[in-house]
Amino acid sequence: MAEWIECKISDIGTVVGGATPSTKKPDNYENGTIAWITPKDLSTFSGRYIQHGERNITESGLRSCSTQLLPKNTVLFSSMAPIGYVAIAANDVCTNQGFKSVIPNENTNPLFLYYLLKYNKDKIEGMGSGTTFKEVSGNTMKNIVVSVPTDKKVQERISSMLGSIDDKIEENERINNNLATHPCNTRIATKQRRQIPRMDECLHTDGKVSDRGGNEETAEQFSSLLTA
């Protein structure tokens, strides 16, 4: 049986904030080639891997503020307005101040970290503070306790299972978006949605992804380990 341990987010990755180059200086943005992500970009983003946002910044824009260039596979987590948008950097990106992103260390699978943060969204949001709107500080993010398997291969198996479910969801969404508004096609789309397993239905005891589940105890165990 895989060993799970409780640890802080800072034990499994490096927490990094972001910033906004001055919009009063056109040179910070015009013809920029560096992807710069804001929470607004993630509000309309439904995938897992993000390449760029609505705007890019330039090298001078990057140097002008405290935003940092984050490497591919960094997990972006919005820490304000709102808390809880999650995506994985598909390439080098930087963000505004609305993120506390996590660069996974060598013992942490990036996709597992993505799902771990998604599962702990409510917990993290509950630790936010502020009067006008809630915000999660860098120090708070670093010290949030999560439960993770020590074996990276176990992390990879878990993320692969959950990734298979998301792959199916995304495939069905693409199909549904291409269907005409004929009543028959509406019924097809409804049937496809019913075939997508809920997260708590995804495991059998043999660890395989299930279309409909069938082992409630294993699923509950799995969910509780992720959200611990």
Where are these regions (language model features)?
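A generic structural signal for well-ordered coil/turn residues at beta-strand boundaries
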Residues: E30-T33, S66, P82, A89, ...
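Structural signal for hydrophobic packing residues in well-ordered secondary-structure cores
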Residues: K121, E125-G128, I169, P183
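Short glycine/proline-centered loop/turn elements that form peptide/ligand docking sites
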Residues: I50-H52, C65, N172
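A short glycine-rich beta-alpha junction/loop motif
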Residues: A2, S79, V93-K100, G130-S159
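A short beta-sheet element
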Residues: G18, T38-K40, E54-K118, G128, ...
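Non-catalytic DNA-recognition/assembly elements of restriction-modification systems
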Residues: M1-T20, N143, S147-S210, T218-A219
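Short clusters of hydrophobic/aromatic residues that line enzyme substrate/ligand-binding pockets
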Residues: Y29, I50, I57, V86, ...
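DNA target-recognition patches
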Residues: E6-V16, T23-G61, R194-A228
